[in-house]
Amino acid sequence: MGDERPHYYGKHGTPQKYDPTFKGPIYNRGCTDVICCVFLLVAIVGYVAVGIIAWTHGDPRKVIYPTDSRGEFCGQEGTKNENKPYLFYFNIVKCASPLVLLEFQCPTPQICVEKCPNRYLTYLNARSSRDFEYYKQFCVPGFKNNKGVAEVLRDGDCPAVLIPSKPLVRRCFPAIHAYKGVLMVGNETTYEDGHGARKNITDLVEGAKKANGVLEARQLAMRIFEDYTVSWYWIIIGLVIAMAMSLLFIILLRFLAGIMVWVMIIMVILVLGYGIFHCYMEYSRLRGEAGSDVSLVDLGFQTDFRVYLHLRQTWLAFMIILSILEVIIILLLIFLRKRILIAIALIKEASRAVGYVMCTMLYPLVTFFLLCLCIAYWASTAVFLSTSNEAVYKIFDDGLCPFTAKTCNPETFPSSNESRQCPNARCQFAFYGGESGYHRALLGLQIFNAFMFFWLANFVLALGQVTLAGAFASYYWALRKPDDLPAFPLFSAFGRALRYHTGSLAFGALILAIVQIIRVILEYLDQRLKAAENKFAKCLMTCLKCCFWCLEKFIKFLNRNAYIMIAIYGTNFCTSARNAFFLLMRNIIRVAVLDKVTDFLFLLGKLLIVGSVGILAFFFFTHRIRIVQDTAPPLNYYWVPILTVIVGSYLIAHGFFSVYGMCVDTLFLCFCEDLERNDGSQERPYFMSPELRDILLKGSAEEGKRAEAEE
């Protein structure tokens, strides 16, 4: 083994040599990767310019309000349609046309109305003044009864027939319902089309389906939004509970690291065990109930997730998943029991480091605030870009007009050649688009918007990692702790990172952002190719997605350790990444023993907090806690606040545990350097604590013997 060490070190770089002047993070350093810093500043200026252009041309009202045939918004304050919030279709049957799928607009006149029609009435039968006044509100604005019936219907001034309707996503759709298996509107199974003929209700269904198909996602979003409006208060309470649990756990970990780790392990096993028991009880309870034996495949996708909870197969699937997870965790604990003891020692040392630099626990709030700014700017820019198209008008005709679907100008159309050749044609609003250079560049601007979001978000995360690494490295390389600790180590590390290493952070974030935007493009292409039958293309796409996923994980790992070296030595990104990689390769056994085991333990801690808060949220929002069952709000989908609480709890727990994770990684890298620089003698003493030295060196020796035995 001894003969192989020179070759091994030569292969993976040269070990650090003893330097009596080295006392931790170097203070006399220079700026690194200045070119990348300039690129970042130029990109930010360009990003601001894109935002200004988007905000100038964009109009979010196009998403919020429906638009009539003249491109005017329904229900918008300050307009003539302020009191007309609903969109009315003259002939809903025309919405069964393929044009709906191509242009997202029905080929029939549409107007804004105060309320949807609530009774049957044809234009032919609206003879009395009372009926005509009612009918007139569904005609085009400014309609005057100075034409014959045939001319009115030909010119599209009024609908041929009014059908009882109800509003759905601010649009009037026929009030269709089933009675004893028969489709009806009101009390009728057929309707008069206004031209003297009677048609079947199924024609209305087809038209409503096509129009409604474009709006189903928006309807789901509206219901989810309604759930948020009535449950946001309780969601915040759930997130506060998650924050309190995370903070309490971290505080206890500071003083009772060993005990808390074992308590965490046992609690995770118990929580999963309870989940298995609860799934089994629900599975048994549904035995014999009507409809509970329907399979998930036969049921298909349902937006109301409560339907799935009435199926035995759902609870069986949950029980199997939790059982597999329980078995995996127990097996890992059995095989990693000795390594867990070593990892606990490292966590104890990390707890002491956090205790001496307590302000590091508040830094995730800074990262959270900066990430919120990035998300808010990206989201608002994306919305304004997507709504910066102009109103496009198309020619619609019921007959065989050769100009159908061609672009037109509503102001000049009545006197145009197209109008003369196709007397029944109409020039009406079709969709939002445009053919200018700006409109052709919208897709590229959206990609740039997404890319800049990834770059800035990764930069914010990198800034946090370098800052925390600098603070914890100052703790490790203090020979007499805490006497040799510098004043305000966190603020000093933050200042050094921004002053000297903005370019290096931008470089690392840029590499990661490029990989992430490629993954987004691959996901987009994969969605477009789903309908294709080319198996080679599908296989190639799957392989590319897998490769770039692995590449992203590797770059994140390398960047994290490179940032630690930047915080300590102040070298540029490439040098830091190379030195960190070689240092890890020279200590590959310790990396496998410690780094991943501590990550596993922290993951269990996150699962414990998320599982506990998630179970509490489930029982609360499903009205299963008797004391407060009347307090829980009524919801369309109770999974909306539950999932929000679960995801939010994980992000909160991850924010707190990320401090510990960065601390462990920094201490581990410093420990590896300490072993190479020093030998534990009085002339070259170790900087690590005696407790950490004893258990880490002992564990490393055991792993080395095991590796030699395997060879």
From Swiss-Prot:
It is found in: Cell membrane; Mitochondrion outer membrane. Signal peptide: none annotated. The chain crosses the membrane at residues 34-54, 233-253, 257-277, 316-336, 365-385, 441-461, 505-525, 564-584, 600-620, 639-659. Keywords: Antiport, Cell membrane, Glycoprotein, Membrane, Mitochondrion, Mitochondrion outer membrane, Phosphoprotein, Transmembrane, Transmembrane helix, Transport. GO terms for molecular function: antiporter activity; choline transmembrane transporter activity; ethanolamine transmembrane transporter activity. It comes from the Eukaryota. InterPro entries: Choline_transptr-like (IPR007603). N-glycosylated. One of its GO terms (cellular component) is mitochondrial outer membrane. Pfam families: Choline_transpo (PF04515). It catalyses: choline(out) + n H(+)(in) = choline(in) + n H(+)(out); ethanolamine(out) + n H(+)(in) = ethanolamine(in) + n H(+)(out). Residues 1-33, 254-256, 337-364, 462-504, 585-599, 660-711 are cytoplasmic. Glycans are attached at N187, N200, N417. It is a multi-pass membrane protein. The modification Phosphothreonine is found at T14. Residues 55-232, 278-315, 386-440, 526-563, 621-638 are extracellular. Disulfide bonds: none annotated. Interacts with COCH. Choline/H+ antiporter, mainly in mitochodria. Also acts as a low-affinity ethanolamine/H+ antiporter, regulating the supply of extracellular ethanolamine (Etn) for the CDP-Etn pathway, redistribute intracellular Etn and balance the CDP-Cho and CDP-Etn arms of the Kennedy pathway. Belongs to the CTL (choline transporter-like) family. This is Choline transporter-like protein 2. It comes from Pongo abelii (Sumatran orangutan). The lineage of its organism: Eukaryota, Metazoa, Chordata, Craniata, Vertebrata. The gene is SLC44A2.
